[in-house]
Structures are given as structure tokens and as C-alpha cells.
């Protein structure tokens, strides 16, 4: 399998995973149907999920369509999940009163004395896979340029 195809498959997995996991995690009693959330907060979560799902569909289209500028298409497609997951690493530092934990009463898993936030683990995995996918694309592109 070529690096270009492997790259597109890996990036597709990240894009689909980003949309599907986000909807699956938020479409429940801890988020959208949480009775303690004000209706407008629920509205914003649904809007965010719709936007993410729509952008993910566009990213997949950009990734797999024939393009006169495949570098631009691949870069934009890669940025969709990367920009979605990035705030999981800094939002709680920038906005006081926010939390990575949906249910503060539920204990977090602890590994080597460090509390592990599942959201951050998922974000980290997706960011790493997106970087690997993009690197595969760029390394294929550089190899292709050298052969010309």
C-alpha cells in the first residue's frame, strides 16, 4: 500500500472517529440531556456537534476527491480534527470554572498517581494519528517530487 493511500485511510479514521465519538459521548444524560444544563447550553452542544459532523463530512470529501491542489485539500482535511481536539489541552487553563470531567462526582482512573482524563487521552490519540497521517502524506509527496 502506498504512503499516500495509507495516509488518506489513517486521516479518514481520525476524521470519522472525531465526529462519531463526539456525538456518541455528548448525546446522553451527562451532556445534551443533562437536566442541570440550561437549555441554551444544550443548544450550543447540539450546534457544535452539527458543525463538527458537517466539517468532518467536508474533510472526508476533500481528502478523497480528485484535486488540482491535493496538498491544500489534505492540509484542510487534517486541520478539521486537529483543531477540534486542540482545545482539550488548554481550555481549562484559559476559562476558569471549566472542567474536563463531565460528572465531577465520578472518580477518574489513576495511573502512577496521575489522574487520567479520558477526553485528553482520546484527544492525544487523535492528534498523534492525524500528525502521522499528515506526515505520511507529506513524505509521499516529497518522494514523488524527487522522482520527477
List each language-model region with its residue ranges.
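Interfacial segments of alpha-helical transmembrane regions
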Residues: 2-15, 68-84
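Hydrophobic cores of alpha-helical transmembrane segments in multi-pass inner/ER membrane proteins
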Residues: 50-61, 122-134
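Membrane-interface capping segments at transmembrane-helix boundaries
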Residues: 135-148
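Alpha-helical transmembrane segments of multi-pass membrane proteins
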Residues: 16-29
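Membrane-interface interhelical loops and short amphipathic "cap" helices
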Residues: 27-43, 100-111
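C-terminal halves and exits of single transmembrane alpha-helices
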Residues: 81-98
Amino acid at each position: 500500500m502506498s504512503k499516500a493511500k495509507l495516509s488518506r485511510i489513517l486521516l479518514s479514521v481520525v476524521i470519522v472517529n472525531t465526529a462519531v465519538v463526539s456525538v456518541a459521548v455528548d448525546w446522553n444524560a451527562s451532556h445534551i440531556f443533562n437536566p442541570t444544563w440550561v437549555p441554551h447550553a444544550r443548544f450550543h452542544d447540539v450546534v457544535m456537534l452539527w458543525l463538527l459532523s458537517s466539517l468532518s463530512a467536508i474533510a472526508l470529501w476533500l481528502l478523497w476527491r480528485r484535486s488540482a491542489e491535493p496538498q491544500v485539500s489534505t492540509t484542510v482535511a487534517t486541520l478539521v480534527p486537529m483543531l477540534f481536539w486542540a482545545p482539550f489541552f488548554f481550555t481549562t487553563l484559559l476559562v476558569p470554572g471549566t472542567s474536563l470531567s463531565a460528572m465531577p462526582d465520578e472518580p477518574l482512573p489513576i495511573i502512577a498517581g496521575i489522574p487520567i482524563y479520558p477526553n485528553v487521552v482520546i484527544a492525544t490519540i487523535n492528534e498523534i494519528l492525524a500528525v502521522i497521517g499528515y506526515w505520511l502524506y507529506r513524505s509521499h509527496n516529497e518522494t514523488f517530487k524527487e522522482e520527477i
